């Protein structure tokens, strides 16, 4: 068992909340070794000042706080958009994309500090335990992984509070939310508590990123998004880096109530779970990018990519970001993006994001071929021979079975 394997130094994924504060102290008590706390800024908008001091007071030998927002946008969110990654046709994978980045950063800290173990606060019923641990196994297979929620005897929040008080750990005085929330640059997810009844509508006061569509502006807003090789590089002609793109689109789309989704998804561990998500900027990018592909990628390649996008999303959701299969899938996706450059015009209005225009210097759309007016490039008479050959299997099957 993990708790019986001797370890010398642990890197803990640390938020400063009740769970990871208790875990920090519990690790020191259980393993009698040095614990380094690691916090990633991935756009969660939480107050990070004072976190280092709190971690040290709770028992950490060091506290790392790293700003990973640009890397998250550039190396994780944007590749997911290029691959049209959407799990079960609804979920844009905000949480799933963040976990491998955090695992990667923790491995780098462990190598720098000579740590031989990792710990996290993910529960034994969720997907995050898999994502964290597969990331570590892929990047540092020799390291030990400690998952306290699968080891200790604490049953819930009340047990943690009692333990924290006994150890002098500051307990947050804020009221517990009636649901769990996870926020980053891509989205906010809400799960559990009052949301466990899949028929109950969420309280409007829950939403933080998006305005209620009913209260959104009465006039639509138009945006022009410029893409180069599948990546958004400018909004309304203004060049921006991936972090700036995400922050700008989150603000604009949120104002118009765009990006809410309420779903029941299939977790990797076999449980069905209700999730409510706000993904304003990601929703715009997903729709705009896929639309631009429609005029810049040929039919057969696009159809194959659409099929592969399902597998791509499942690989992300299931924690396989660093796997060999993921590398192969991403290589195909990257090749398809060579000509996905152009401009997409978006209309935002009361919760709806609509593509209303697209153009590209490398477009495969030929109006002279598509026109219903006078034809010069397309001879309709050619269709007869094509249909005769294309329909031959169906025709012969029907003819022979009638005998």
From Swiss-Prot:
- Write out the entry's keywords from A to Z: Amino-acid biosynthesis, Arginine biosynthesis, ATP-binding, Cytoplasm, Ligase, Nucleotide-binding
Tell me the superkingdom of the source.
Bacteria
Q: Name one GO molecular function term.
A: argininosuccinate synthase activity
Positions annotated to bind ATP: 13-21, 40, 121
Which pathway features in its UniProt record?
Answer: Amino-acid biosynthesis; L-arginine biosynthesis; L-arginine from L-ornithine and carbamoyl phosphate: step 2/3
Binding sites annotated in the UniProt record for L-citrulline: 91, 96, 127, 131, 180, 189, 265, 277
Name of the protein in question:
Argininosuccinate synthase
Species of origin: Leptospira interrogans serogroup Icterohaemorrhagiae serovar Lai (strain 56601)
Organism classification: Bacteria, Pseudomonadati, Spirochaetota, Spirochaetia, Leptospirales
């Amino acid at each position: 068992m993990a708790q019986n394997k001797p370890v010398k130094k642990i890197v803990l994924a640390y938020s400063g909340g009740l769970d990871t504060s208790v875990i920090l102290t519990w690790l020191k008590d259980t393993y009698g070794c040095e614990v380094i706390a690691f916090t990633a800024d991935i756009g969660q908008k939480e107050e990070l000042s004072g976190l280092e001091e709190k971690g040290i007071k709770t028992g950490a030998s060091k506290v790392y706080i790293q700003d990973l927002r640009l890397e998250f946008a550039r190396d994780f969110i944007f590749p997911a958009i290029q691959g049209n990654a959407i799990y079960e046709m609804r979920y844009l994978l905000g949480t799933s994309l963040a976990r491998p980045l955090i695992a990667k950063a923790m491995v780098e800290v462990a190598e720098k500090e000579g740590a031989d173990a990792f710990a996290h606060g993910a529960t034994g019923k969720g997907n995050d335990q898999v994502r964290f641990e597969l990331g570590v196994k892929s990047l540092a297979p020799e390291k030990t992984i400690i998952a306290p929620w699968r080891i200790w005897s604490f049953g819930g929040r009340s047990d943690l509070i009692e333990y924290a008080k006994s150890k002098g750990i500051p307990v947050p005085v804020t009221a517990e939310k009636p649901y769990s929330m996870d926020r980053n640059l891509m989205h906010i997810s809400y799960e559990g508590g009052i949301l466990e009844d899949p028929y109950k509508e969420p309280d409007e006061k829950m939403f933080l990123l998006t305005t209620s569509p009913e209260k959104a502006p009465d006039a639509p807003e138009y945006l022009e998004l410029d893409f180069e090789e599948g990546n958004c590089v400018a909004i309304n002609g203004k060049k921006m880096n991936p972090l700036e793109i995400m922050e700008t689109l989150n603000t604009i789309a949120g104002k118009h109530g765009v990006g809410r989704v309420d779903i029941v998804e299939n977790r990797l561990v076999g449980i069905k779970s209700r999730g409510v998500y706000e993904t304003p900027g990601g929703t715009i990018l997903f729709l705009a990018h896929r639309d631009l592909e429609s005029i810049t990628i040929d039919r057969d390649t696009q159809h194959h990519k659409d099929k592969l996008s399902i597998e791509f999303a499942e690989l992300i959701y299931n924690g396989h970001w660093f796997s060999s299969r993921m590398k192969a899938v991403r290589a195909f996706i990257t090749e398809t993006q060579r000509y996905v450059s152009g401009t997409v015009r978006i209309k935002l209005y009361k919760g709806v994001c609509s593509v209303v225009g697209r153009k590209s210097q490398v477009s495969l759309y030929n109006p002279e071929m598509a026109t219903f007016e006078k034809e010069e490039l397309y001879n309709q008479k050619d269709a007869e021979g094509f249909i005769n050959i294309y329909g031959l299997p169906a025709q012969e099957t029907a003819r022979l079975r009638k005998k």
